[in-house]
Amino acid sequence: MLKILIPTMMLLPLISYSKKEWVWINSSIYSLLISSFSLLTLNQHMDLGLNFNMSFSADSLSSPLLILSCWLLPLMILASQFHLMKEPMAHKRTYLMLLVILQIALLMAFSAVELIMYYILFETTLIPTLIVIARWGNQTERLNAGLYFLFYTLLGSLPLLVALIFIQTQLGSLHILLLTLTPNPLQDNWSNDILWLACMLAFLVKMPLYGFHLWLPKAHVEAPIAGSMVLAAILLKLGGYGILRIIIILEPISKFMAYPFIIMATWGMIMTSSICLRQTDLKSMIAYSSVSHMGLVVAASLIQTPWGFMGATAMMIAHGLTSSMLFCLANTNYERIHSRTMLLVRGLQMVLPLMSSWWLLASLANLGLPPTINLIGELMVIITTFSWSNFTLILLGLNTVITAIYSFYMLITVQRGKLTSHSLSINPSFTREHMIMTLHLLPLILLTLNPKLILGLTYC
């Protein structure tokens, strides 16, 4: 782990001491080298001797998420250049250093082997994200969005802290490996039911489950591009990763405690997909589609079958890349037209023809068309939920149809139609933007050739 952590930490002095004309170039190239080097940790075998120490370890569940975190840092830096062009150099350095600190916290969170360490790092990610949203957001509502983000996350995670301290006093350890090997089935009584809720609530808020999702559209809409990318691609995955880690020690009461949450997740997918059909704000639509896709991950994780865990892991990686790409595309429009309203950015196919091809590919990936990894994740989740209850096939089928409708609605509204008068004199697309889209799309397609790399612990 130190082979990735120490170079990432050294980004901080690099950003501080680089000459002002070299800050963007140095940070982009260096972070791209770190992300390339992190690919060596991808093919994790069950023998973790080389990777294991008392504090941090990577296995086949955490290594895909670690690499996703490393992969997105250079893309966030590249995507933020135009946004910060007119800022003073001190503000640019602060912004980049916040992204690096967030990256370090995420790498340590995904590789932590103690649950209390995971909790501390889970909360640590809140601080740089909140500063990025509240300081560099576009509208005055960013402070309101930051408050929503802060209070939802804190109120959801306080019961988790109490539950972890209780488990520590009962079992004497919060080490992930020891907890999975300790035969301690929870008895069916009301106190253990409350313990289950306390453990799961923080992760369900972070995912977010429908009903706890109100902070997400606000935070996404008001965040700058790097904030939206890291929120959609990685921070939501902290919730899914936490569920997959902690649900093993909550047996056997998960079997009936999870029922209402699985139903809420599948129903929430339909509701949030339907909300997408009524959105006029482009970033808000992409944010609600994230809630819909995360509903699939929640349902698959709580059903607790090997296929469910594999489907949830694949969906998390696929959604991270797809939603980040969609936010980058929305940002390219915003940089030129200074509006997120879809009616005002219509007809861009005539002005930016190559960018419209990226829009088409991102929309197809969002609705899970082959050859993207989204398809493999969605198929596994659909099979899992169908084996749990036949009725869920109707809900998931309806969700797939609505997802296809709003994806094409978004594509047609933004790219087709009559060009508005203020869109006639916009800047052409840049090589930087095409590189960002390529680096998002390549993993989505190439992972289909060898999906076992991201299918997690239960792949055999």
From Swiss-Prot:
Its membrane topology: Multi-pass membrane protein
GO cellular component, one term: respiratory chain complex I
GO biological process: aerobic respiration; electron transport coupled proton transport; mitochondrial electron transport, NADH to ubiquinone; mitochondrial respiratory chain complex I assembly
Keyword Membrane: yes
GO molecular function, one term: NADH dehydrogenase (ubiquinone) activity
InterPro entries registered for this protein in UniProt: NADH4_N, NADH_Q_OxRdtase_chainM/4, NADH_UbQ_OxRdtase, ND/Mrp_TM
Subcellular location: Mitochondrion inner membrane
UniProt keyword list: Electron transport, Membrane, Mitochondrion, Mitochondrion inner membrane, NAD, Respiratory chain, Translocase, Transmembrane, Transmembrane helix, Transport, Ubiquinone
Pfam families: Oxidored_q5_N, Proton_antipo_M
Catalytic activity: a ubiquinone + NADH + 5 H(+)(in) = a ubiquinol + NAD(+) + 4 H(+)(out)
Lineage top rank: taxon: Eukaryota
Listed EC numbers: 7.1.1.2
Residues spanning the membrane: 22-42, 65-85, 96-116, 117-137, 147-167, 194-214, 230-250, 256-276, 284-303, 308-330, 350-370, 373-393, 394-414, 435-455
Entries under PANTHER family matching the protein: NADH-UBIQUINONE OXIDOREDUCTASE CHAIN 4 (PTHR43507:SF20)
Family: Belongs to the complex I subunit 4 family.
Task performed by this protein: Core subunit of the mitochondrial membrane respiratory chain NADH dehydrogenase (Complex I) which catalyzes electron transfer from NADH through the respiratory chain, using ubiquinone as an electron acceptor. Essential for the catalytic activity and assembly of complex I.
Subunit structure: Core subunit of respiratory chain NADH dehydrogenase (Complex I) which is composed of 45 different subunits.
NCBIfam families documented for this protein: NDH_I_M
Protein name: NADH-ubiquinone oxidoreductase chain 4
Protein species of origin: Ornithorhynchus anatinus
